[in-house]
UniProtKB/Swiss-Prot annotation:
Keywords linked to the UniProt accession: Cell membrane, Membrane, Transmembrane, Transmembrane helix, Transport
Record membrane topology: Multi-pass membrane protein
Family, similarity comment: Belongs to the major facilitator superfamily. TCR/Tet family.
Protein name stated in the entry: Multi-drug resistance efflux pump PmrA homolog
Pfam (any one): MFS_1
Summary of the function given for this chain in its UniProt record: Efflux pump for various substrates.
GO molecular function: transmembrane transporter activity
Source organism per UniProt: Lactococcus lactis subsp. lactis (strain IL1403) (Streptococcus lactis)
Length: 405
């Protein structure tokens, strides 16, 4: 079979954008009513919060733990195969939750979904390997908007669908969306993957040894981890924090939802444009600017006096995320040997997922022991460390447009 035919990376970007949008929305669609659904399975009292927390965190934790394994298999068998595998399992598990007889089945299916996930990191690895190097920031920035858009639209749409069709049927609807993503991927995504001969497959250690700059690789993985910590740490207590900023409790949940989603909205609006800027002026420069901007915006959140001020700062914070995510992915694609792209992006996904789990834990722990404002200050310290580390990594490249020059 001829595997050297040039692929249309723009068409692949379009189709994978749709797939990533469906995957992103599938996770967030069920967020508004999942605790109520768990309650309907016979769980009562304080156990509802416990099992809800497990239902939310288990997929991210499981996905992070097995990401390197799926990354290796993607390097062996191709990214498209892994995307189809992930979307099929997500279709079955999300749809299957509609028939869960008790909370243990629900948790088991959520855990299984996490173990077999990987659609988004494999889409990212595929586009990173196919897009021209001078377009990688734009391509990866555009792809990043898919997950963010789905995550933004999901909660509000999920609440409406639950009221119209019932909570169980929403899981069937999500399963149908994921099935559509599977079919689109099978028939319209093309990859000229050349299998590596048996015995020539490089180990993860050998892949890392072939990375052109291991110090920068480690720094990019740390940045990926901290991006999620800064965006997620406030979520466990944001409603309670807002409550301390106002004497009115009218529409408190609605206001909290707007403030939480503000980061995603601005990131969605800016990622593609900022990705182009990274291609033009240097992704490493944009990472430093994004980190400094993130710190300048994040720290004042600890000193706001009204929900409006917090909302504005959260919205501005998204522009930092919009700069960082595509820039990190673009640099990863440039410093990674092509035979190890999937594994390196799998490690990035692992760091992202661990940040999603660590952020709420760190934020809620500091908020519980000290205060909400202290939690925000504490989280901002992670950003300072990242700024210093990134400056050390990039200092000799600041006068260059690319770290590969």
């Amino acid at each position: 079979m001829n595997r050297t035919k040039t692929v249309n990376w723009k068409r692949n970007l379009f189709i994978t954008w749709i797939g990533c949008f469906f995957v992103g929305s599938s996770f967030s669609l069920v967020m508004p009513f999942l605790p109520l659904y768990i309650q309907g399975l016979g769980v009562s009292g304080g156990n509802v919060e416990l099992y809800s927390g497990l239902a939310f965190s288990l997929p991210a934790l499981a996905s992070g733990l097995v990401a390197p394994i799926w990354g290796r298999l993607a390097d062996e068998h191709g990214r498209k195969v892994m995307m189809v595998r992930a979307s099929i399992v997500m279709t079955l598990t999300m749809g299957g939750i509609a028939f869960a007889p008790n909370v243990w089945w629900l948790l088991g299916l959520r855990l299984l979904m996490g173990f077999f996930s990987g659609y988004i990191p494999n889409s990212t690895a595929m586009i990173a390997s196919q897009a021209p190097k001078d377009k990688s920031g734009y391509a990866l920035g555009t792809l990043a908007t898919a997950m963010v858009s789905g995550t933004l639209i999901g909660p509000s749409l999920g609440g409406l669908l639950a009221e119209w069709f019932g909570m169980a049927n929403v899981f069937l609807i999500v399963g149908a969306l994921l099935a559509l993503a599977t079919l689109l991927t099978i028939f319209f995504v093309h990859e000229n993957f050349e299998p590596i001969a048996k015995g020539e497959m490089l180990s993860s250690k050998e892949i890392i040894n072939k990375v052109s700059n291991k110090q920068i690789l480690f720094g990019l993985l740390v940045t990926t981890f901290i991006i999620q910590i800064t965006s997620q740490s406030i979520e466990p207590f944001v409603t309670l924090y807002i409550k301390t900023l106002t004497t009115s409790t009218n529409n408190l949940m609605f206001i909290s939802g707007l403030i939480v989603s503000a980061v995603g909205l601005s990131a969605m609006l800016s990622s593609s444009f900022l990705g182009r800027l990274g291609d033009k002026y240097g992704s490493h420069r944009l990472i430093l600017i994004g980190l400094v901007f993130t710190f300048i915006i994040y720290l004042p959140m600890a000193f706001v006096q009204s929900p409006l001020q917090l909302g504005i700062l959260r919205f501005l914070l998204g522009f930092g995320t919009g700069a960082l995510t595509p820039s990190v992915n673009s640099l990863l694609s440039k410093i990674t040997p092509k035979e190890g792209v999937s594994r390196i992006f799998a490690y990035a996904q692992m760091c992202s997922n661990l940040g999603m789990v660590t952020g709420p834990l760190v934020g809620s722990a500091i908020a519980g022991y000290i205060s909400y404002r202290a939690a925000i200050v504490g989280t901002s310290l992670f950003v300072i460390v990242n700024i210093i580390w990134s400056f050390i990594n990039f200092r000799k490249y600041l006068r260059k447009r690319s770290i590969m020059e």
